Amino acid sequence: MKGSGRCRVSDTSMFTNLRADKELAGKTQMEILQDLPYSLCQPGPANVDGVGNYYLQIFGAAPSTRPVATIYLLDSHGQIPSTTNVNRNPDYEPIKHSQIAWFWSTSQALRREREDNGDADSFHTSIVFQHIPLPEFDDPKLIMHAGCRGEPTEGPSQNTYFYDALVGAGVAAIGCGHDHVNNFCALLPEQWRKKEKAGPWLCYGGCFGFGAYCEYDGKRYWRRARVWELGVGMKDDEEEGVVRTWTRVEYQKERKGEIVLVNNDTVQGGAGDSYGSK
């Protein structure tokens, strides 16, 4: 956060098990984040579980007032004793039903607003970010594209089916962290077979910080950060309606595992041969 302030870059944050497990109350933490220079953090509705369930809209170049993307950020809570018969340790709280209801009502209200403003046929994409992965990230049938699985998915054993709400709302991708040496983007088979209007893509960010582990089972992985690029046609060489992602790897300049998630305003599925580990 300090680095982004020095560079005068707007930033935002979501709550994770790393903050939820601390003594400082979430509300107080959010107040601190809001006071930082260039911070876009918001506390979110008081009647929704967790702190920091909110959305940000990205608009086209001025003088346009048309939103080209909506970014949703959700609190993924903290660690809990296992709630299933499976000996699962650690286990984590799932996304709560109040959060799913908030996401659905908000996304549909924003959709209706775009329709009322005559923007229904214009490019718009939605991306969700949360720290702890959904249970779907652990599906053994995932079709991976760009990147690899370096460790098992560590997420909630209880599935509250937030993924189904993402499908219904037409979300292009969900990005998460938590599992430091996973860095893939993937689709469930039923979404892959759609060829188009698939999604959401399930994308890991990889290990970014130097204060965290970056190895598993004795194997070291390069630290990396996932970059998301949204094309809105502001530049002559920029494609409108395209969303790309890749990882920037420690000590390397080239893009790794670059993939087009959305092309011509359509979430892509079955896009070709999967990428190997990079």
Q: Residues of each region from the PLM?
A:
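His/acidic metal-ligating clusters that form di-metal
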Residues: 70-72, 85-187
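Binuclear metal-dependent phosphoesterase catalytic core
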Residues: 55-59, 182-278
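Extended active-site neighborhood of metal-dependent phosphoesterases/phosphodiesterases
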Residues: 2-120, 223-229
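Structural recognition of the beta-strand scaffold that forms the well-ordered cores
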Residues: 6-12, 16, 55, 70-74, ...
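Short, glycine/charged-enriched secondary-structure capping and boundary segments
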Residues: 23-29, 87-88, 142-144, 188-191, ...
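Residues that flank catalytic or metal-binding motifs in active/ligand-binding sites
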Residues: 50-52, 67-70, 124, 170, ...
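Short, small-residue-rich loop/turn micro-motifs
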Residues: 75-78, 132-134, 206, 249
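Active-site environment of divalent metal-dependent phosphoester hydrolases
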Residues: 1, 7-8, 14-22, 80-82, ...
